[in-house]
Amino acid sequence: MDKVSDDVKQQVDQLKEWANRQPNLPKDIEDAILLQFLHSCYYDLDKSKVTLELFCSIRSSSPELFTNRDPSSPPMKKALQILNLAHYEIPGRRFVWIWQLNDPSLENYDYVQDAKVFMLTTDSWLLSDKKLEEDDMVIMDVKDISLKFITKFNVSVAKKLSKYQEDAMPIRLKQIHIVNAPPFVDKLYALLKPFMKQEITNMIHFHTPNSQTLYDYVKKEDLPSDYGGTRKSMVEFNKDAMELLESRREILSDDNLWRVEKKSKNKNEFSSDVGSFRTLAID
């Protein structure tokens, strides 16, 4: 973790003292994690408090996404096996996050499990000793996506995932790129767009197969070899990601990581089964 000034250390202490007084927040959150919240909010203490509270609140109210997620458990291994994931730094203190699906039939794809994997892997990266980034770029490779995805989609989880990504994660998200976008991508995008703020939709860029438009936003050499770059392949990056998960397995398997168990007045308030599209048939 980067060295910080005395003023920033004081802000970290203030954020920790405040968090420890809140009954709905976990106690004694690590300084390195609190620093990431401050940095992502450009050291605005009040905004950091709001972001941290939402981060913990979503986690506490979403047991289907943040519990029972041992990376070595059969359900998680099954979900991880059809994905290649990457997270690495490029010049300018920028970080690239890449999600690549490898399941052409979508037979093994589960939207809820995919969201759970996202939470798990981003937690592992938050726990790693990384530099404080200037901005984050997300690349999603949808080469294996088909209209069958609609039958896998889950409205409730999509709402939580969008809220978490937009307002709760301690990152400086600046760009989202959808590569190998099929002709019907607009139909899939229409499912997700209602849950996104305009600020996020303005960040999204679509790139058709074999196009070179992604290079307008990131230098070709800074991409994995899968995309014509000089970096490692996605398979190699994914191996690094799996090794990181294994090294953090004990803490990631803790169901109380940055969560405070809370009871909902409405028993079904946070059920991820509500709004599922699984009953639809796609020809």
Please state what every model-predicted region is.
Residues M1-D283:
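Basic, amphipathic alpha-helical/coil surface patches used to engage anionic, phosphate-bearing ligands
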